[in-house]
Amino acid sequence: MKVRKGDTVLVISGKDKGAKGKVLVAYPDRNKVLVEGVNRIKKHTAESRTERGAASGGIVTQEAPISVSNVMLLDSDGKPTRVGYRKDDETGKNVRIAKSNGKDL
């Protein structure tokens, strides 16, 4: 999966199309990412007591994961780009590059 935690992405399809956000969690086994402020859902939680005796519960709004195919990585110029790889000459490791301008991500 070419999108990692901490990347800034643009949502390219779905109900939040056009939204930008930071990747909070990447789930490579499920091909999903959790993006800040995108795909907000209302979760109904049961009431439970905390150690101070305050009741917590009700309807909580939180982000839900979306498919990685619905997001595009933003390059250093803030434009959506596809991701490529190249070998680093010094370390020999793969480095992600932006296909739009060829710069490292």
Curated annotation (Swiss-Prot):
Family of this protein: Belongs to the universal ribosomal protein uL24 family.
A GO BP entry: translation
Keywords linked to the UniProt accession: Ribonucleoprotein, Ribosomal protein, RNA-binding, rRNA-binding
Cysteine disulfide partners in this protein: none
Record carries keyword rRNA-binding: yes
Region (Disordered): 77-105
Subunit organization: Part of the 50S ribosomal subunit.
Ribonucleoprotein recorded as keyword: yes
Stated name of the protein: Large ribosomal subunit protein uL24
Biological function: One of two assembly initiator proteins, it binds directly to the 5'-end of the 23S rRNA, where it nucleates assembly of the 50S subunit. One of the proteins that surrounds the polypeptide exit tunnel on the outside of the subunit.
GO molecular function per UniProt: rRNA binding; structural constituent of ribosome
Bias (Basic and acidic residues): 77-93
InterPro entries on file: KOW, Rib_uL2_dom2, Ribosomal_uL24, Ribosomal_uL24_CS, Ribosomal_uL24_KOW, Translation_prot_SH3-like_sf
This protein's GO CC annotations: ribonucleoprotein complex; ribosome
